[in-house]
Amino acid sequence: MDIIREIESEMLRKDIPDFKPGDTVRVHFKVIEGGRERIQAFEGLVIKRRGKGLSETFTVRRISYGVGVERVFPLHSPRIEKIEVIRRGKVRRAKLYYIREKIGKAAKIKELFEAPQKEDNIQEETNA
């Protein structure tokens, strides 16, 4: 079993930002149409993350022309170019399936405001 974990750990991506359900993300992924390859962005609310290791996936939901669209992305897929965290959401659930029934303003997630880091002050105090 350790051999499998070793091989999987080599394939894991290191450039994935820290995000969780409730966050709004923009996923840039490669789409192959015919012989052409282009990058397409999909922005929406993360409603769940599941699994671990190489098989970890996350589901992003957005409303497009009045219709809810959900897309499941493998987290460590080579087709994902990058993941941007647009805003952090304040939720108390790991799976946000209840958002599917909500419409309009009721489907909004409160934004989580983080205090700015004070790394500069800490470094100045240690140098003095």
Curated annotation (Swiss-Prot):
Provide any one GO MF term from the record.
structural constituent of ribosome
Determine if Ribosomal protein is one of this entry's keywords.
yes
For this UniProt record, the keywords arranged alphabetically read as follows: Ribonucleoprotein, Ribosomal protein
Pfam families with a match to the protein in the record: Ribosomal_L19
Gene3D superfamilies on file: 2.30.30.790
What is one cellular component GO term in this UniProt entry? cytosolic large ribosomal subunit
Mind listing the GO biological process terms from this record? translation
Q: Record's InterPro entries?
A: Ribosomal_bL19, Ribosomal_bL19_CS, Ribosomal_bL19_sf, Translation_prot_SH3-like_sf
The entry's function note states: This protein is located at the 30S-50S ribosomal subunit interface and may play a role in the structure and function of the aminoacyl-tRNA binding site.
Classification via NCBIfam families: rplS_bact
UniProt record similarity statement: Belongs to the bacterial ribosomal protein bL19 family.
Q: What is this protein called?
A: Large ribosomal subunit protein bL19
